[in-house]
Every structure is written in C-alpha cells, then in structure tokens.
Amino acid sequence: MTSTERVLAAIADQPPDRIPLFDSFWAEFVQRWRQEKGLDASADIEAYYGIDIAICVPDETPWPSQAAELERSETGVVTRDGWGAIHRTRSGAHFYQEAGVALADKRDPERLEFEAPEADARYAGFLRSLAHARAAGRCPFAKTGGPYLRTMNLR
C-alpha cells in the first residue's frame, strides 16, 4: 500500500497493511540523529522511518506580513510573529520568552483588523509543503487551528 492508501484505509475502518505512522521532529533532534547515525545533511528522517502522514498548514496568523526578525546578536534573536507577539530566543534554545503581545488591553479585541484570509502569501508555504508531501509519497493532511485554538497568542 502507498501511504495515502494506508491512511485512507485506516480512516475508513478498513485493515491497512500496517498502522499508518506520524511523527514530527525538532530540527535539533534531526541534526543530532544524523550525527549519531553517521548520515549526511540530506538524510530525510521521515523517509528513514517510513512516516506516512504530512501535516500541511497555511499561515493562520492575523498579520502574516508583519512577521519579522527585529534584532539579532550573539546572545539571541528578537522576532515578531504573525500574531503580533514579540519573542526573545536565546542562541541554541528552542523555546522563547514572550516580550510583548498584540492586544495589551484585553478588553477590546473587536478593534483588531486582520489581514485577508484569502491572501496568496498565506498559502505559499502550504502549497510548498503539500507538493513536498506528495513528492515524498506521504498522505497530506490540511489542518486549521489558528483562528480558534491559537487566539491566546493575541493576549
């Protein structure tokens, strides 16, 4: 079975040839994995382990055009994401310190004006990840969660 056949069989409650696999890996893990396995930088961890599912996501943030790197130094980087939040990340760290939010006054969310949901820029990364998933033989899944799940990032 192909990955898509396997995943669709499982979703349809039909027996696949094996359980469809999904995992996601931090970049630091993949780098260490390549070192430990003696593999070069082109080694694809998802192909190595037979991952079947690829999650493809458009940019769900309210202001994708405002995402930017604001400052970089030897100690780290300061960025603004598409939610309007300011993040300070130390060099070599995966997690960040939140240094600011878009909605400082939590009483007035209706005043916010978001960029158009149909803007082409929101879907460029989605289309690239979809093409990559298909080329790699994985079953692509599109998801949304930003407008509902991630609005906490505004505050």
Predicted regions and their residues:
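Catalytic cores of TIM-barrel enzymes
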Residues: M1-R155
